[in-house]
């Protein structure tokens, strides 16, 4: 009875009411590198875009996608990066996917909805590649997984992607001395966009535990030793969260190289381990790098050179300059015995 009462009294908004279509026509074109940070609620959400390509990182914790007011003006979302399995980043993405499914099922209504309103509902960006590390148990939907909000959201994400015909791509880095970039976009005369994966590591203990043994609980003993020597009891989705460094290389050598780090929910030690593998990259050795600066020789700062020159000059001047001679004593002259003429005049007047 309580369920029937709720179904009669509570109205669930449709995907088109939750994510309204744009009010104006045309698409938004982002020509310069930019990064939009959205109010993700308890989670995060950001969009990084360059001229010709964009990447959406996570979607926030609300079903009403916090990024929708901007994204609905784009003709395409080229890539979506889901850093981890969680209720703080998947609901916003699921809201977008649910709307895309509703667009496929939408038919011209014979009721009050006019043809123009029906066509407006179909205006939304196309979806490109989706990066998402998913355990094998979630794909098979085994009943052994514990019921949890994050697991439910991940299952919904997989169901929606399957209906849309999108296969999520895994993302990790191979154990090597250095990290090779993943080319996301390259256009002659415009630039190149690369992505370096810092975490997780392929075939590591964390990834094997996530893919094979993780039962959906928030914290579990992974058998992995932390830097303090104790066995790690940490959230497995956080331990295997994707951390990516996105780098934009413009074609113009005088333009700035843009570097954006998306840490996800990875622990700090995992992020630092990945950054150690990137120490050989020249564009990380400058605070504001350009390809013109990297091509030139490395020169120390001017301030340090002037200080060194001043010290060497002072030492050489001390060696070359003669020692100052002692001042000669000055003889004191005796006062003269003559009377000043003024005294005589003063006496005569008296």
UniProtKB/Swiss-Prot annotation:
<dbReference type="GO" id="GO:0008017">
    <property type="term" value="F:microtubule binding"/>
</dbReference>
<dbReference type="GO" id="GO:0000226">
    <property type="term" value="P:microtubule cytoskeleton organization"/>
</dbReference>
<dbReference type="GO" id="GO:0031114">
    <property type="term" value="P:regulation of microtubule depolymerization"/>
</dbReference>
<protein>
    <recommendedName>
        <fullName>Electromotor neuron-associated protein 2</fullName>
    </recommendedName>
</protein>
<feature type="region of interest" description="Disordered">
    <location>
        <begin position="305"/>
        <end position="350"/>
    </location>
</feature>
<dbReference type="GO" id="GO:0005875">
    <property type="term" value="C:microtubule associated complex"/>
</dbReference>
<dbReference type="GO" id="GO:0007409">
    <property type="term" value="P:axonogenesis"/>
</dbReference>
<dbReference type="GO" id="GO:0005829">
    <property type="term" value="C:cytosol"/>
</dbReference>
<dbReference type="Pfam" id="PF25281">
    <property type="entry name" value="MBL_MAP1B"/>
</dbReference>
<dbReference type="InterPro" id="IPR026074">
    <property type="entry name" value="MAP1"/>
</dbReference>
<dbReference type="GO" id="GO:0012505">
    <property type="term" value="C:endomembrane system"/>
</dbReference>
<comment type="similarity">
    <text>To T.californica electromotor neuron-associated protein 1.</text>
</comment>
<dbReference type="InterPro" id="IPR036866">
    <property type="entry name" value="RibonucZ/Hydroxyglut_hydro"/>
</dbReference>
<keyword id="KW-0472">Membrane</keyword>
<dbReference type="GO" id="GO:0045202">
    <property type="term" value="C:synapse"/>
</dbReference>
<dbReference type="GO" id="GO:0016358">
    <property type="term" value="P:dendrite development"/>
</dbReference>
<dbReference type="GO" id="GO:0030425">
    <property type="term" value="C:dendrite"/>
</dbReference>
<dbReference type="GO" id="GO:0016020">
    <property type="term" value="C:membrane"/>
</dbReference>
<dbReference type="GO" id="GO:0003779">
    <property type="term" value="F:actin binding"/>
</dbReference>
<dbReference type="GO" id="GO:0005874">
    <property type="term" value="C:microtubule"/>
</dbReference>
<dbReference type="GO" id="GO:0043025">
    <property type="term" value="C:neuronal cell body"/>
</dbReference>
């Amino acid at each position: 009875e309580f369920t029937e009462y709720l179904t009669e009294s509570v109205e669930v908004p449709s995907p088109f009411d939750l994510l309204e279509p744009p009010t104006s026509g045309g698409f938004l074109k982002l020509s310069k590198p930019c990064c939009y940070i959205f109010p993700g609620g308890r989670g995060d959400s950001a969009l990084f875009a360059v001229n010709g390509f964009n990447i959406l990182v996570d979607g926030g914790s609300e079903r009403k996608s916090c990024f929708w007011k901007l994204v609905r003006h784009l003709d395409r979302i080229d890539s979506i990066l889901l850093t981890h399995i969680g209720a703080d980043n998947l609901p916003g993405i699921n809201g977008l996917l649910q709307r895309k499914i509703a667009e496929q099922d939408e038919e011209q209504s014979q009721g009050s909805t006019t043809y123009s309103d029906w066509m407006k509902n179909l205006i939304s960006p196309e979806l490109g590649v989706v990066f998402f590390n998913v355990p094998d148990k979630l794909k098979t939907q085994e009943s052994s997984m514990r019921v949890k909000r994050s697991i439910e959201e991940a299952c919904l994400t997989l169901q929606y992607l399957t209906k849309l015909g999108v296969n999520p791509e895994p993302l990790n880095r191979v154990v090597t001395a250095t990290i090779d970039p993943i080319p996301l976009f390259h256009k002659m005369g415009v630039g190149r966009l690369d992505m370096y994966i810092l975490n997780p590591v392929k075939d590591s203990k964390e990834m094997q535990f996530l893919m094979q043994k993780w039962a959906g609980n928030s914290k579990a003993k992974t058998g992995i030793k932390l830097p303090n020597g104790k066995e790690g009891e940490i959230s497995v989705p956080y331990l295997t969260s994707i951390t990516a460094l996105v780098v934009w290389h413009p074609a113009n050598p005088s333009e700035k190289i843009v570097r954006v780090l998306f840490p996800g929910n990875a622990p700090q030690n995992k992020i630092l381990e990945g950054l150690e593998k990137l120490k050989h990259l020249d564009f990380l050795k400058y605070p504001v790098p350009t390809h013109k600066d990297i091509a030139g020789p490395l020169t120390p700062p001017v301030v340090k050179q002037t200080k060194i020159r001043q010290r060497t000059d002072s030492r050489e001047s001390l060696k070359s300059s003669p020692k100052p001679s002692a001042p000669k004593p000055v003889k004191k002259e005796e006062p003269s015995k003559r009377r000043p003429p003024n005294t005589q005049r003063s006496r005569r007047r008296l």
